[in-house]
Swiss-Prot record:
Residues 278-295 have a biased composition (Low complexity). Residues 63-252 form the B30.2/SPRY domain. Keywords: ATP-binding, Exonuclease, Helicase, Hydrolase, Nuclease, Nucleotide-binding, RNA-binding. This is Probable ATP-dependent RNA helicase ddx1.
């Protein structure tokens, strides 16, 4: 019996992962998979390389497959007719015949998310929505339930009103602050309301009054109105809040004497809006016909069988899972992993789409198809805005490397989230190596409901198998390495000091020291490579320009003519900018396959890229935060392999580019500081290094660029199982031996006592 079977994973998926040599689940998989399969939001933090992708991909894949086989509860078939309030047909609530009233998917603000009769907005601006139908006669009533804290205003509005109800003469509202509003006149009325309160809204066309209730308490007349003004629609405006409507499809929390649920009324639509709504329905159906794209493709009998039901009924599959990755490489990795995991899932075959910049998405020409969609933030945002992705049936919303996504693309993530169907069916999953920042926690609180935290590492955890070392880039101490007369091999620097450093002299000026540090770091890089005889390493630099210059420097040092193990300094570059997707992928594969020894990159590669057994990592430039340091060094020390992380730390501050110009550095030569209108800053590596020293205590390499003698036996890149390092555990094992025996005896005694307890009780009686 597989250990994954204990977690509830399908046999077909287990068969696929066993072929990948996944025999035992990692700790993060053991914790997260059952939680996700069981439903609910999950926030998981675990060390880099711990199997986080499998932790969310396996359960997502399983539930998607079960849903397609109609073994799950959520709907996946595109509707072909108007549904009721809860997704069921008919009038509901004992009236209205085939008439139904819903929240209008069209007449809403862009940041208002809708799931059936639940609406939510996490924007700091007011976001409004109206119902699809209204009334013009009778006495009717509806309720709304406040589902979390926030600001909201509820009431009635004409179709021509602003969505910010209560601010014009065509709408009437009652807000959570205990005020009624009409034409932007806010007057005390009733009582304030908040989370879990039930607000009733009633309208009486006979007496021409509008009023409100709170938890059954009637506050009486709030407004008078002209009953001939038109059709009155239920309406709502929110700010960072969530509410649920009940138009009468289920029993009201508090009945109001003399009033009927609004869905029992003669429901009406303004004539000018009916065409728009009908077109919307037609557009949705046309888009959904493409489904997973199988209607257009002939892949043999298996595919024909898989799509028989969909083709016959013309009811295409809808996307169930959306996974956002911060980089192309991570998206591609997750895509490949899910394809591997789903190898034996047939009837139907899971359709997976990859949406990244610079690549054509798998699927139709205008419609992105797939049961699972994986993509990068910018690309997904564009596709959602174009209407190329149907998010109406999303079951899983996954943020992988969530902290980076939130730091760099919060607005995009929020935009996409607000397009999802919120409610009980949506599971939000956060995965990363670090989830402890205030910004991440705040966003989690906004978009998750009672999430389960899985934290297997604590704040800023780093695997024990990584040795941390550093070299101080002191241009005075290592003067012989960078002075022109001593070493003609020089790196081309970034040009920051092209006009203010003509001679170095005795390095009295900060600019002179800064330029000297730039020249020195390249020489220190060579020394470290040669000292440890590095055959494979990732080198992190701060900017694309730095990466390109390091790459050229290594070529000049002898890495340009040969490749792989034959080239001592053979290298390739991985960063953003003009390095297009195909080239980036090729460069990464060259490094993985051993065609080059060194991968030079910016932080674009710091998240999630999996290169097994990588022995070395070099920080040519320190990252801007300790958390980014964690992600960088996480490239080594994986799969029980011993790793070494070396940082080249500037002895003084270094002046570097920090482009605020429109073209982001293209053709820019403005070396003034940013506070003076320029595009440069002083980068304080000594200060950045303080956090690393306090938390880790790295070892300084000696004058020969070596570790202390007692650490020289470490086999970097080698397995802990194959080195003498395992011998260090023998004394500890012997020490624990007696305690384990005692624990075993105690366990045996307790079990015997438990089993004999009934006999002893009988004797006492």
């Amino acid at each position: 019996m597989s250990a994954f079977e204990d977690l509830g994973v399908l046999p077909e998926i287990i068969k696929a992962i066993e072929e990948l040599d996944w025999l035992l689940p990692t700790p993060i998989q053991t914790e997260a998979i059952p939680l996700i399969l069981g439903g609910g939001d999950v926030l998981a933090a675990a060390e880099t390389g711990s199997g986080k992708t499998g932790a969310f991909a396996l359960p997502i894949l399983q539930i998607t497959y079960e849903t397609l086989n109609k073994k799950a509860e959520i709907p996946i078939i595109a509707p072909t007719n108007t549904s009721g309030e809860d997704g069921t047909s008919g009038g509901g609530g004992g009236g209205g015949g085939g008439d139904t009233i819903e929240l209008d998917q069209i007449d809403r603000d862009k940041n208002m998310a809708v799931d059936g009769l639940i609406c939510q907005s996490r924007s700091s601006d007011w976001c409004g929505i109206k119902a699809t139908k209204g009334i013009s006669s009778g006495k009717f009533y509806y309720e709304s339930i406040v589902r979390d804290e926030g600001l909201c205003r509820i009431g009635f509005a004409l179709k021509k009103s602003s969505r910010n109800i209560g601010t014009d003469k065509f709408s009437w509202g009652y807000g959570g602050t205990g005020k009624k509003s009409h034409e932007s006149k806010f007057i005390d009325y009733g009582k304030p309301f908040g989370n879990n309160d039930v607000i009733g809204c009633y309208i009486n066309f006979d007496e021409e009054i509008i009023g409100f209730t709170k938890n059954g308490q009637d506050f009486g007349e709030a407004f008078t109105f002209n009953s001939k003004a038109g059709i009155f629609y239920p309406a709502l405006v929110l700010k960072n809040a969530e509410m649920e409507f009940n138009f009468g499809s289920k029993p009201m929390k508090h009945d109001l004497k003399g009033y009927k649920p609004i869905n029992q009324a003669e429901l009406l639509i303004d004539q000018q809006t009916s065409t728009q709504i009908d077109n919307s329905k037609n557009n949705n159906n046309n888009n959904n016909k493409k489904g997973s794209g199988n209607n257009k493709k002939n892949k043999g009998k298996d595919d024909d069988k898989m799509n028989d039901e969909d083709n016959n009924n013309k009811q295409p599959r809808k996307t169930l899972s959306l996974i956002i990755e911060p980089t192309r490489e991570l998206a591609d990795q997750a895509y490949s992993a899910i394809l591997n995991f789903s190898k034996y899932l047939d009837s139907p075959k899971i359709q997976v789409s990859l949406c990244i910049g610079g690549e054509k998405s798998n699927g139709g020409r205008n419609k992105i198809e797939g049961d699972i969609i994986i993509g990068t933030p910018g690309r997904l945002e564009s596709l959602v805005k174009e209407g190329s992705i149907d998010l109406s049936s999303i079951k899983f919303f996954v943020l992988d490397e969530a902290d980076q996504l939130i730091d760099d693309n919060l607005a995009i993530v929020n935009f996409i989230y607000n397009k999802l169907p919120i409610g009980q069916n949506l599971q939000v999953l956060f995965f990363s190596a670090t989830l402890h920042s205030t910004k991440v926690i705040k966003f989690c609180e906004q978009i998750t409901k009672n999430p389960t935290w899985v934290d297997l590492k604590g704040r800023d955890f780093i695997p024990d198998l990584i040795t941390h070392a550093y070299v101080k880039a002191d241009p005075i101490k290592f003067e012989s390495l960078w002075r022109n007369s001593e070493n003609p091999l020089r790196i081309r620097t970034d040009g920051v000091h092209a006009s203010d450093v003509q001679q170095f002299g005795k390095l009295k000026e900060p600019e002179q020291k800064s330029e000297a540090i730039k020249l020195l770091k390249a020489q220190l890089l060579l020394k470290c490579i040669q000292s440890f005889k590095m055959d494979q390493a990732i080198i992190f630099a701060r900017t694309r320009l730095d990466c390109d210059h390091i790459h050229q420097f290594l070529k000049d040092a002898g890495g340009g003519n040969t490749s792989g193990l034959e080239g001592e300094f053979s290298s390739t570059v991985l960063h953003g900018g003009d390095n297009i997707s195909r080239a980036r992928k090729d460069n990464l594969e060259k490094f993985r396959n051993g065609d080059v020894r060194f991968l030079i990159c910016t932080d674009v590669a710091a998240r999630g890229i999996d290169i097994r057994g990588l022995p070395y990592m070099i920080n040519y430039t320190l990252p801007e935060s300790f958390e980014d340091y964690i992600h960088r060094v996480g490239r080594v020390g994986r799969s029980d392999r011993i790793g070494l992380a070396i940082s080249l730390v500037a002895y003084e501050q270094e002046k570097v580019w920090y482009h605020t110009c429109r073209d982001k550095g293209k053709g820019c030569h403005n070396t003034k500081l940013t506070e003076n209108g320029g595009c440069c800053i002083w980068y304080d590596e000594p200060q950045l290094f303080t956090a690393i020293q306090e938390n880790i205590g790295p070892i300084e390499l000696d004058s020969d660029f070596q570790l202390p003698k007692d650490m020289k036996q470490l086999n970097f890149g080698g397995s802990t199982k194959l080195t003498g390092a395992s011998a260090d555990y023998k004394p500890h094992t012997e020490e624990l031996r007696s305690r384990v025996l005692q624990l075993s005896q105690l366990e045996e005694t307790i079990q015997i006592d438990y089993l004999t307890l009934p006999k002893r009780i009988i004797k006492l009686k």
